[in-house]
Amino acid sequence: MQISGYTFRLFQSHPLANTSKNICDISSKSTICRLKDVIHIGFKWINDYKLLKNWQDFSALFYKHLKDTDTLDPFYFELLDSASQNWNKQNSKRVAIESYVKLLAHEGRLHNEFECFLCASSIKEDDISLLRAFLPTHKICSHTFGIKKSSLNELFQNKSTLFLNNNEVDRLWYILLEGL
């Protein structure tokens, strides 16, 4: 079977959809194809405004973080996919924080040695403050709220927010929104 050059270019520029159907409609009125039968892949939580807003804020950080890369590791897709599946099963902020810690660990930017980012001395206090990218600091150095060292250790080692209370999760959420 011979494929014309136009049809070949069409399939190159518009790949087949997940259902293995052609998603382009060829029109004799124009040289540009029209997309047909394209639907939004929905989630169970898509109609919940708070969950959707948190998802948009979280996924927008990935655009800013990955926009200049040429190739992407499948890790990023798998991370977002697993987060989207757990988004309505758990507190969405907890899912985002756990995913962010996994991202930092994958990229080698997770600072779990608890050395102050600002003064470069070891943090011996029980409360640790965090800055953007979850950089640890003394409460005195950063003048921000602290989080228990044992809870942060659990978060960084096991990627779990189980031992964080809701106020600490909200604090980490706002730090997360500062950027990846």
What are the residue ranges of the model-derived segments?
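Non-catalytic alpha-helical scaffolds and adjoining flexible linkers that form interface surfaces
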Residues: 1-180
